[in-house]
Design a protein with these regions (language model features):
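Non-catalytic signal-transmission and effector/linker regions of two-component phosphorelay proteins
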Residues: 1-6, 117-130
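Charged docking surfaces used in two-component/phosphorelay signaling
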Residues: 18-26
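Helix N-cap/capping motif at the beta->alpha junctions
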Residues: 33-42, 63
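Short amphipathic alpha-helix used as the core "switch/output" element in two-component signaling
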Residues: 42, 64-77
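Active-site beta3 strand of CheY-like receiver
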Residues: 47-53
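Active-site residues of response regulator receiver
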Residues: 55, 85
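Receiver (REC) domain active-site loop signature in two-component systems and cognate sites
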Residues: 58
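Alpha4 helix (beta4-alpha4-beta5 surface) of REC/receiver domains from two-component response regulators
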Residues: 65, 88-110, 117-121
Length: 130
């Protein structure tokens, strides 16, 4: 029986997604990648992962909308979601805030630049693997 945990990384920056994917695979996770919110939702519906790393600012559907849709769906509401955003550290008011992230019922919220190690640590904690 395969007990390997599956992680979906949804980020429109291929280089960042690749770094996170590589780090997670080194830690023994199976990783799938999507490059926008619509593709991410399709991958969740086709094969639900054990956890999701979800960028906030993406084309087609942003991470807040994707997170909200998943948390409101009984089939997917228990999948841990980590939201990532580059705007959390901005002093000026933006359309994306930490409070917005937590309002989506995300399980964790990490500001970019986030290290792949920080993301891996959060996933392990959320999946009770730490």
């Amino acid at each position: 029986m395969n007990l390997q945990k599956r992680i979906l990384v949804v980020d429109d920056e291929p280089d960042f997604a690749s770094i996170v994917q590589g780090n997670l695979e080194k830690e023994g996770f199976a990783v799938d990648v999507a490059y926008n919110g619509v593709e991410g939702l399709q991958k969740v519906q086709a094969n639900p992962p054990d956890a999701i790393v979800l960028d906030v600012m993406m084309p087609e559907k942003d991470g807040y909308i994707v997170c909200r849709e998943l948390k409101e769906d009984d089939k997917y509401c228990n999948i841990p979601i980590i939201l990532l955003t580059a705007v959390a550290s901005h002093v000026t008011s933006t359309r994306y805030t930490h409070a917005d992230g937590m309002a989506t019922e995300a399980d964790d919220y990490i500001a970019k630049p986030a290290s792949a190690e920080e993301i891996t640590k959060s996933i392990k904690k959320l999946l009770d693997l730490s």
